[in-house]
């Protein structure tokens, strides 16, 4: 925890394979996020209440390793924000496909499309410590966004879980 004195908030890899106490340690030390959370009970959910620690669910890892699903719906029902990210890495989650993560959020974790969009944008930006500049379409923030192919409502985004619905992508205010 030496980084705290230099303004660095910890990120805790917690409760992926077993209930480890990592969630409570993260909250105790003011971690910006606790990540994975496949093994969570009510005690862990309660410990997150009132904290500034973002619970971050990694659906790609749970899918690839055939782990239990994090109780994202229970966390939201308890009044907690939830972030969802890909955990893109070659060992446990070899996909950075955020459209798939958004679909999994709705289909497997039972988030509404609005909750899933929030979990994969603003809440994830918070979990990375960059929500002041990224994560939402707000004056003064960096314009990183996607433009989808035409769809009549947000609910169609997670529905097309196997198709690329991105028509254009903007990074730093410029289409790429």
Listing of model-derived features with the role each one plays in the protein:
Residues 1-20:
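Metal-dependent enolase-superfamily TIM-barrel catalytic cores that perform enediolate-based chemistry
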